[in-house]
Amino acid sequence: MIQGAQTDFIHILKKYKKSKRYSELQELHIQCVVDELKGNNKEEHFHKFFEVLQSSLSTIGSFKFLVLCHKLIYQLQQEFAIRFIQNKLIPGDDTDKSRLAIYYYNFLFKLCENFDYYKEVIEFIETDNIEKFMKYELFVQIQILYPLAQILQELSQVVKLLDYLLCRESPLLLQLGTCILKDFCYTF
């Protein structure tokens, strides 16, 4: 395990949340989501977000779980945008932005503090078990990003197929399962 990640995960995360860089990342997150909702060009905020993230990581050390956390949260933007558009909550004034921020970061904090998930992810990466990591990522995406019953039903069939293919010893079946998994990760 990464030094400190197992014994002091929550403490480090809370300390990081109080830092100036984390506040800047929060603001950029919100602005990127607002850009997404309004259909604005988000390239500037997108690049700035990763600049700040890189700077942050060089300060606190090589905590891979923070990279994964921010990358996964960044992937959630489209889902948040869809939900807000469906509920006609396009942010226009500060009140709407505050509501968006509360909704967005309540979810962020819950995800960040899910130590078991990050412990698994870190172990997958450190043991170079990429197939297992990708498969686990797909399960997480299904559970978190796509809670609708119809989508779950469709994807559960894919998961069963992947589970079968990825457990085979045949290199060809393993390769097939990996290709399907990659395709679904990119698609969704």
Regions found by a protein language model. Give the residues of each.
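Eukaryote-specific intrinsically disordered, low-complexity regulatory regions enriched
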Residues: 1-188
